[in-house]
Amino acid sequence: MKIIQEIPEKNIIKLIPENLDDLWHLSNIIQPYNAIYAVTERRTEDKGDKLRADRGTKRRVFLGIKAEKINFHEDFNRLRVSGKIIHAPDDIPIGSYHTIDIEPLLQVSVQKNWKKWDLVRLKEAEDSSKKPKVVVVILDDSEADIFLVREFGIKELVSIKSGVSKKLDYKQNEQAKFSYYSDIINSISEFEGKILFAGPGFGKNNIQNYISEKHKDLAPNVVVESANHTGKSGLSEILKSGIIDKIYGEARISKETQVIEKLLEEISKKGLAAYGIESVNNAMNYSAIDTLLLTDEYLRRNRRNIEELMNSVENINGNVLIISTEHDAGKQLKALGGISALLRFPIE
């Protein structure tokens, strides 16, 4: 995310989202009644040719809308914000509806009452654009699962079988193994960033040696770590371990996974945790909340009702962390009602 300009007296921040992660961050920052300004396409009628049955022509115009609906479309790499027009050229009626498609590299101005957690999230998005992206390959001698680590979740890219079998002789297995390595490399060769190989056994070390010999250009980006499991279980193990943070700086998904692990640990021992809206509100009555945890879905559904609680946590120097439901940690928080808190001290 690039922050272009801040205009505090108007509560406006001009910014440019650079990738899908930035669009996801914006989807959690923009809320109903915020004003959004951007260059967009608008279909207008040709006044001189009213007999034509077409829908007019599209042209690029600078519009402002008051947001009503905010929809993040991962598959289409865009964020759609719909609402009534509040600023437009003279020939476009104020109050009519429009949808602005926010895509990477489109400059957008957001006008809102900026909260601390909004600004923290914006800073995280700005910092994350400077960090290396990470692909995780969880493998053993028989199968490799390749994942892309994003700010808001994990994308499973491909699963590759090795073809190695006890039914084959040594030479055939060696050929199958090198073909396996080649398929893995082909799947990640165009990726610009760090590549983490992890899993049980020596498969991760063997492919590292193969890369050092055959693909020297990739070798500097390769990191190898141990994991006890393969597949998604191995990936979950890696996310909980903090290894991603050592490579990435502090990956948001890793941070979210670790904080939910801490929450579940505290719940299991009836320690410094509260979950469910009643329990969390009770903790706030004692000013006991250190970190308020909300799923993005819960926040979108209840933002107007929950914002007072978020402000109260901020006023006692607590933290507010919004957890994505696109990964397992977010799903675990969702199962707890979508809202929980880590506490400063125990309460009855």
Curated annotation (Swiss-Prot):
It is an enzyme of class 3 (hydrolase). Coiled coil: none annotated. Keywords: Cytoplasm, Endonuclease, Hydrolase, Metal-binding, Nuclease. InterPro entries: eFR1_2_sf (IPR042226), eRF1_1_Pelota (IPR005140), eRF1_3 (IPR005142), Pelota/DOM34_N (IPR038069), Pelota_arc (IPR023521), Ribosomal_eL30-like_sf (IPR029064), Transl-rel_pelota (IPR004405). Its EC number is 3.1.-.-. The keyword Hydrolase applies. Its cofactor is a divalent metal cation. Gene3D superfamilies: 3.30.1330.30, eRF1 domain 2, Pelota, domain A. One of its GO terms (cellular component) is cytoplasm. GO terms for biological process: nonfunctional rRNA decay; nuclear-transcribed mRNA catabolic process, no-go decay; nuclear-transcribed mRNA catabolic process, non-stop decay; ribosome disassembly; RNA surveillance. SUPFAM superfamilies: Dom34/Pelota N-terminal domain-like (SSF159065), L30e-like (SSF55315), Translational machinery components (SSF53137). It is found in: Cytoplasm. GO terms for molecular function: endonuclease activity; metal ion binding. May function in recognizing stalled ribosomes, interact with stem-loop structures in stalled mRNA molecules, and effect endonucleolytic cleavage of the mRNA. May play a role in the release non-functional ribosomes and degradation of damaged mRNAs. Has endoribonuclease activity. PANTHER family: PELOTA, PROTEIN PELOTA HOMOLOG. The N-terminal domain has the RNA-binding Sm fold. It harbors the endoribonuclease activity. NCBIfam families: pelota. Monomer. Belongs to the eukaryotic release factor 1 family. Pelota subfamily. This is Protein pelota homolog. It comes from Methanococcus maripaludis (strain C5 / ATCC BAA-1333). The gene is pelA.
